[in-house]
Amino acid sequence: MLADKVKLSAKEILEKEFKTGVRGYKQEDVDKFLDMIIKDYETFHQEIEELQQENLQLKKQLEEASKKQPVQSNTTNFDILKRLSNLEKHVFGSKLYD
């Protein structure tokens, strides 16, 4: 997937040879610059791999979560009030109704 979009690999950059002219660039400067580019490419590649793995993991988690039964939300206000009333009777007993 990513290989289709990226034109150069770190290895290709490393192995690239430049022709020198009469007053060409300093080879040492070119090598240093290419080394920086290679390090960046390797860092980007590693980051992309990690993000793709995380993306797959999150998609699986989402799929699993959507397959699970939804939490029962059948508890209505009436049920809550009924439970509350029973708890009050149990805690306060007959004091509540005196």
Swiss-Prot record:
Induction context: By high-salt conditions.
Recorded coiled-coil stretches: 34-71
Highest taxon of the lineage: Bacteria
Gene3D superfamilies in the record: 6.10.250.660
Gene Ontology CC: cytoplasm
GO biological process: cell division; peptidoglycan-based cell wall biogenesis; regulation of cell shape
Family the entry assigns: Belongs to the GpsB family.
Subunit structure: Forms polymers through the coiled coil domains. Interacts with PBP1, MreC and EzrA.
Record function comment: Divisome component that associates with the complex late in its assembly, after the Z-ring is formed, and is dependent on DivIC and PBP2B for its recruitment to the divisome. Together with EzrA, is a key component of the system that regulates PBP1 localization during cell cycle progression. Its main role could be the removal of PBP1 from the cell pole after pole maturation is completed. Also contributes to the recruitment of PBP1 to the division complex. Not essential for septum formation.
NCBIfam families hit by this protein: DivI1A_domain, PRK14127.1
Classification via PANTHER family: CELL CYCLE PROTEIN GPSB (PTHR35794:SF1), CELL DIVISION PROTEIN DIVIVA (PTHR35794)
Annotated protein name in UniProt: Cell cycle protein GpsB
Native species: Bacillus subtilis (strain 168)
